[in-house]
């Protein structure tokens, strides 16, 4: 799946993400469950500072990319192919992390399972955001993307939100989740070529080449390149990246 291969073009999470997650584990076992781990950014970023990680994802393609990292061979990591609702777990966990994955889960099944798997007093942390924040081209890009979806699907998307709009709302709202805090990381500057920026876009489900098909992917890239060239310097785009982290306790019922 090309979507998984394009994940390497996403910006890294800020260091503040990892320090925050480690703070949340301070009084608990240094064992994490990375739920919907994708290509393993959270697990691989924490593994030198924890005792063990179970990293679960439904996509074999994502896990293949994760396992290709040199750090992925650590005996402290168990890569598990399966759904978080049914995958074999090895609790208790000092922290469960769902990084840009909670929206894919059946929460009525998953949250009670998390409650059972967490050590006493341990937290669930959910993350959102590894995309440009307040980029100079955001207005043009957004208008194009909304029109592109409307042309593809026959109607304008009612789910569309900018990163700022998403940051203003909780990532997870569910009766079984008791939010205890949140943090929006400080912005950090990231640069990449237009070609790599487009590959990053193709790592997102709405814009994946598997979703769009070959013809629409070429059209998408051509229009986006026209927009982005106006903002690039020597072919490079520079933008800020931020992440919203929120954490809380999970009840079984």
At which residue positions do the language-model features occur?
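Conserved class I S-adenosyl-L-methionine
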Residues: 1-27
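Short conserved AdoMet
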Residues: 26, 47-51, 106, 119
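Class I SAM-dependent methyltransferase SAM/SAH-binding core
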Residues: 31-33, 39-86
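A short acidic, Gly/Pro-enriched loop at the edge of an enzyme's catalytic core
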Residues: 88-96
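A short beta-strand submotif of the Rossmann-like class I SAM-dependent methyltransferase core
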Residues: 98-99, 107
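A short, conserved alpha-helix within the catalytic core of class I
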Residues: 105-114
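Conserved catalytic/acceptor-binding region of the Class I
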Residues: 115, 119-190
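Conserved Class I S-adenosyl-L-methionine
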Residues: 163-253
């Amino acid at each position: 799946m090309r979507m998984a291969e394009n994940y390497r073009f996403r910006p890294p999470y800020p260091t503040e993400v990892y320090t925050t997650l480690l703070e949340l584990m301070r009084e608990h076992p240094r064992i994490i469950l990375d739920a919907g781990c994708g290509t393993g950014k959270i697990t691989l970023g924490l593994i030198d500072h924890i005792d063990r990680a179970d990293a679960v994802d439904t996509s074999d393609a994502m896990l293949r990319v994760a396992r290709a990292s040199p750090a992925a061979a650590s005996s402290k990591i168990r890569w598990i192919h399966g759904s978080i609702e049914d995958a074999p777990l090895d609790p208790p966990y000092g922290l469960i992390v769902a990084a840009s994955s909670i929206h894919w889960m059946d929460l009525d099944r998953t949250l009670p399972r998390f409650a059972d798997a967490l050590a006493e007093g341990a937290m669930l942390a959910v993350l959102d955001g590894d995309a440009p924040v307040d980029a100079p081209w955001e207005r043009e890009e957004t208008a194009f993307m909304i029109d592109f979806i409307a042309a593809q699907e026959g109607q304008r998307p009612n789910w569309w939100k900018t990163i700022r709009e998403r940051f203003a709302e909780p990532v997870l709202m569910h009766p079984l989740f008791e939010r205890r805090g949140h943090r929006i990381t400080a912005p950090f500057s990231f640069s990449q070529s237009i070609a790599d920026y487009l590959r990053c876009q193709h790592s997102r489900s709405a814009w994946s080449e598997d979703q769009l098909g070959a013809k629409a992917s070429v059209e998408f890239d051509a229009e986006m390149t026209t927009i982005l060239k106006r903002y690039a310097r020597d072919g490079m785009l520079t933008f800020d990246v931020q992440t919203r982290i929120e954490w809380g306790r999970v009840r079984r019922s």
